[in-house]
């Protein structure tokens, strides 16, 4: 389906495959493209348990399309309108979704496959960096409010000894529950990533509120730091609010 998006752009709802699942996305192209003309493109990744219609995806896509880029925003597996086990958010699976999105976008007739970048915020920022570290096709990366080491990030987000003991006990109980029942232990999102009460109204409408404990474990084990050096000499821009109340600023690089 093709339709008029924001001024100076056209949007098309798309689906594409990722590990046997169909993912839902939106491609936006700038007005005025000439037949056969190819433009650089950017993939814009959503945050933790969010979706492609979040402002953090929609607004960057509008800005980039106004600048002449083709953009793709999409729902990761298990999120939004995409297929997959709902609420199962696993870091390395999202990396795979990102690489498969690139394969799809590279086939677009108005995209220069040599100039496809990736950007994301928060969880999507960490996934963007990791994906670029393992997939040389990604030409550049913009990370906004991301994190490089899951253990270090969580230690800052659960800062007291009591909070850390509670969090790590949840991880262990998740493993025992899975072994005992064959089912996932479901955990509220704010027990994984604490967000101050006064900021929770900013969580995107439709965001997932309960996750399997395996989600928290995958984040705990995730280390974009291990692959970030492989991005060079491709450009990498790390952005982070100086007073981030959710992901500590220094976690963008450590």
Predicted regions located by residue number:
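N-terminal cap/lid segment of alpha/beta-hydrolase-fold proteins
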Residues: 2-37
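Accessory cap/linker subdomain of secreted extracellular hydrolases
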Residues: 145-219, 224-225
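Conserved alpha/beta-hydrolase "acid-adjacent" motif
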Residues: 245-251
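Conserved alpha/beta-hydrolase
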Residues: 61-81
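Catalytic nucleophile-loop/oxyanion-hole region of alpha/beta-hydrolase
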Residues: 52-54, 79-117
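The serine-hydrolase catalytic nucleophile loop
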Residues: 49-62, 76
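Short beta-strand/loop motif that positions the catalytic acidic residue
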Residues: 231, 238-240
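Primarily recognizes the serine-hydrolase "nucleophile elbow" in alpha/beta-hydrolase
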Residues: 100-181
């Amino acid at each position: 389906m093709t339709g008029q998006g924001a001024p100076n752009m056209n949007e098309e709802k798309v689906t594409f495959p990722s590990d046997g699942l169909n993912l839902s996305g939106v491609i936006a192209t700038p007005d005025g493209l000439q037949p056969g003309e190819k433009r650089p493109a950017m993939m814009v990744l959503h945050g933790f348990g969010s979706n492609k219609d979040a402002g953090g995806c929609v607004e960057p896509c509008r800005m980039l399309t106004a600048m002449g880029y083709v953009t793709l925003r999409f729902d990761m597996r298990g999120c939004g309108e995409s297929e997959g086990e709902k609420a199962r958010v696993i870091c390395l699976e999202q990396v795979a979704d990102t690489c498969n999105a690139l394969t799809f976008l590279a086939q677009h007739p108005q995209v220069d496959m040599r100039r496809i970048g990736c950007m994301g915020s928060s969880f999507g920022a960490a996934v963007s960096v990791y994906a670029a570290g393992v997939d040389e096709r990604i030409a550049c990366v913009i990370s906004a409010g991301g994190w490089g080491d899951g253990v270090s990030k969580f230690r800052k987000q659960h800062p007291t000894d009591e909070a850390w003991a509670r969090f790590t006990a949840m991880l262990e109980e998740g493993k025992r529950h899975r072994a005992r029942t064959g089912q996932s232990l479901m955990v509220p999102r704010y027990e994984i990533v604490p967000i101050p009460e006064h900021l929770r109204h900013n969580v995107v409408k439709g965001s997932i509120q309960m996750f399997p404990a395996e989600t928290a474990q995958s984040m705990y084990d995730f280390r974009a730091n291990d692959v970030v050096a492989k991005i060079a000499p491709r450009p990498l821009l790390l952005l982070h609010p100086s007073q981030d109340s959710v992901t500590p600023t220094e976690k963008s690089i450590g």
